[in-house]
């Protein structure tokens, strides 16, 4: 590339996301947990004024967002924080271009572990990339626990596959093992593809 764009200047930005309907580009700065939006007229990312909350509902900081995921309608947004061990959820108004109701949806802020459960009763350690299936369930790579978790639309987290121990075993969902999975995405064939980081492999889970 001859021209490169610095998305958020001195604030470290790890992931961005393109809105599925409007084509808008968003990112979250690590330093102040602020959501940024690309302004084509200024050719730069500008702050929206919306910051992610911490456990007390105050403005968070040093939140390492690994995935920004919109639903197909573009009205709901999910964000995974690797270092705070939570999944955020919020609303997006396309007509106004505004986020609202951003809250910690699943997991416990700054608390490590892996516990199946509803919403903030659940625990997950280092959630990374996420994707949605046709029924609205979210699948998330839980890096530190070597698991792929499933979250239902009402916020129930369960283990989808992975034993919790690092390994490279193929097999059924209850026996397969991973080693720090970070990325995942559904392919056009309906299969779930997983970037298994320390195994240096792309794994595939066939569609049922």
Segments and roles (model prediction):
Residues 4-6, 10-11, 15, 42-66, ...:
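Gly/Pro-rich loop segments of beta-rich domains
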Residues 33-37, 85-89, 146-150, 156, ...:
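A short loop-to-beta-strand structural motif that recurs across blades of beta-propeller domains
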Residues 180-208:
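Blade-level signature of beta-propeller repeat domains, shared across WD40, Kelch, NHL, RCC1
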């Amino acid at each position: 590339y001859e021209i490169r764009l610095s998305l958020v200047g001195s604030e470290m930005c790890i992931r961005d996301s393109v809105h599925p309907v409007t084509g808008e580009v968003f990112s979250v700065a690590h330093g102040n947990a602020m959501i940024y939006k690309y302004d084509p007229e200024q050719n730069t990312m500008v702050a929206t004024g919306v910051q992610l909350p911490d456990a007390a509902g105050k403005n968070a900081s040093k939140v390492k967002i690994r995935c920004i995921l919109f639903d197909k309608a573009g009205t709901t947004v999910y964000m995974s924080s690797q270092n705070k061990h939570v999944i955020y959820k919020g609303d997006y108004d396309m007509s106004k271009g505004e986020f609202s109701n951003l809250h910690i949806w699943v997991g416990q802020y700054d608390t490590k572990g892996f516990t199946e459960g509803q919403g903030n009763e659940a625990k997950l350690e280092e959630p990374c990339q996420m994707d949605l299936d046709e029924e609205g369930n979210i699948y998330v790579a839980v890096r530190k626990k070597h698991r792929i978790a499933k979250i239902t639309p009402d916020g129930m987290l369960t283990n989808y596959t992975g034993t919790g121990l690092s390994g490279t075993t193929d097999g059924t969902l209850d026996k397969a093992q991973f080693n720090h999975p970070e990325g995942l995405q559904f392919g056009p064939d309906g299969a779930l593809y997983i970037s298994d980081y320390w195994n240096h492999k792309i794994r595939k889970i066939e569609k049922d």
